[in-house]
Amino acid sequence: MTDPIADYLTRLRNAISAKHRVVEVPASNLKKEITKILFDKGYILNYKFVEDGPQGTIKVALKYDSVNKVNAIKKLIRVSTPGLRKYTGYKDMPRVINGLGIAIISTSKGVMTNKEAAELKIGGEVLCYVY
């Protein structure tokens, strides 16, 4: 697999479109950090790391509106790919849907949202947009 982050986002997208409640994805440290950000920002209901084998899996419980069964995540867009990396400085931090969404940035201080990176005045690789 050449792009595990794109695979992770695609698994989430497919589970959302199929209206699944829980999706299992192969674990990695970067995927754990992205999942933690999605949980902290309220895009997913819950997550759990399960150690089964050398790598383990992450069980992600998706968040749906109780009235009209709409998911909290409208779009997941992969920005930086292995073939074309996208970097940004803290002055040029992307605004996703005029501040309503988040960009997940991989920085020297770890994985964080665009707002957190701008507050710390550090740039990094733009992994994906979530809204």
Curated annotation (Swiss-Prot):
Cross-referenced PROSITE patterns: RIBOSOMAL_S8
Listed SUPFAM superfamilies: Ribosomal protein S8
Entry-linked InterPro entries: Ribosomal_uS8, Ribosomal_uS8_CS, Ribosomal_uS8_sf
GO cellular component, one term: ribosome
UniProt-recorded Gene Ontology molecular function terms: rRNA binding; structural constituent of ribosome
Gene3D superfamilies: 3.30.1370.30, 3.30.1490.10
Entry keyword Transport: no
Superkingdom of the source species: Bacteria
Signal sequence, start to end: none
GO biological process: translation
The keyword rRNA-binding is assigned to this record: yes
UniProt KW keywords: Ribonucleoprotein, Ribosomal protein, RNA-binding, rRNA-binding
Family: Belongs to the universal ribosomal protein uS8 family.
Function, in words: One of the primary rRNA binding proteins, it binds directly to 16S rRNA central domain where it helps coordinate assembly of the platform of the 30S subunit.
Assembly and oligomerization: Part of the 30S ribosomal subunit. Contacts proteins S5 and S12.
Protein name, UniProt field: Small ribosomal subunit protein uS8
Organism of this sequence: Phocaeicola vulgatus (strain ATCC 8482 / DSM 1447 / JCM 5826 / CCUG 4940 / NBRC 14291 / NCTC 11154)
Lineage of the species this protein comes from: Bacteria, Pseudomonadati, Bacteroidota, Bacteroidia, Bacteroidales
